[in-house]
Each structure stands twice: as C-alpha cells, then as structure tokens.
From Swiss-Prot:
HAMAP family: Fe_S_insert_ErpA (MF_01380). The gene is erpA. GO terms for molecular function: 2 iron, 2 sulfur cluster binding; 4 iron, 4 sulfur cluster binding; iron ion binding. NCBIfam families: iron-sulfur cluster assembly accessory protein, PRK13623.1. Iron-sulfur cluster binds at residues 42, 106, 108. This is Iron-sulfur cluster insertion protein ErpA. It comes from Klebsiella pneumoniae subsp. pneumoniae (strain ATCC 700721 / MGH 78578).
Length: 114
C-alpha cells in the first residue's frame, strides 16, 4: 500500500525493522508478521503474533521497509486506529499493540476488552 493512503492500522518503523531482521534470520523472504486477536486472557481478548507466508482472501497487508504486516478482517475491526510497534527495555523486547478501541487492558498489555 502507498504511504500517502490513510491506513486503519499503523506499522511502525521499529516494528518493520525488527520484522526485517527476523525474516532475514529465517532466510524466507515470503514471511510476513501476522497480528491477530483471539478470545482469552484476563480481559477477554488477547493479541497474537506469528510469522506467516500465506495471505488469505480478505486479509489486509501493510508494507513498510519491504516487509509486510498481515491482519485478518475479524481482527482488523478491533484494531482500527491502533498501531503495531516493537520495543526493547528492562521488561524485555516484544511487539506491542496500541489499541484505542480497548476499554480496559490487563497489567501486561497482552489482553484487552472492548
């Protein structure tokens, strides 16, 4: 997708850079980072991340730095207006989702309710 089109989900430079390095380590340029939402966690829904070389019908792909972030339509409806970022700190390193649709989140930030 073009950089001048408003996207429903932001894929940050830090996240794209980390994905680029992880894909290089796997030696499979077809891999993309898939973010998804499942039921569970202490707040009702939880975020999940996996590498996937498949893009399914209806999936949205956001390209940055030559790598892709893939989101299925069911998950996207809960993520609109949010961002996928990557952080490194005292708590470790991880991909994180900032979700303006979440009414509450758990302490670790991996689950939420709407």
């Amino acid at each position: 997708m073009s950089d001048d089109v408003a996207l429903p989900l932001e894929f940050t430079e830090a996240a794209a850079n980390k994905v680029k390095h992880l894909i290089a380590d796997e030696d499979n340029p077809n891999l993309k980072l898939r973010v998804y939402i499942t039921g569970g966690g202490c707040s009702g829904f939880q975020y999940g991340f996996t590498f996937d070389d498949q893009v399914n019908e209806g999936d949205m792909t956001i390209e940055k730095q030559g790598v892709g972030l893939v989101v299925d339509p069911m998950s996207l409806q809960y993520l609109v207006g949010g961002s996928v970022d990557y952080t490194e700190g005292l708590e470790g390193s991880r991909f994180i989702v900032t979700n303006p649709n979440a009414k509450s989140t758990c302490g670790c930030g991996s689950s939420f309710s709407v």
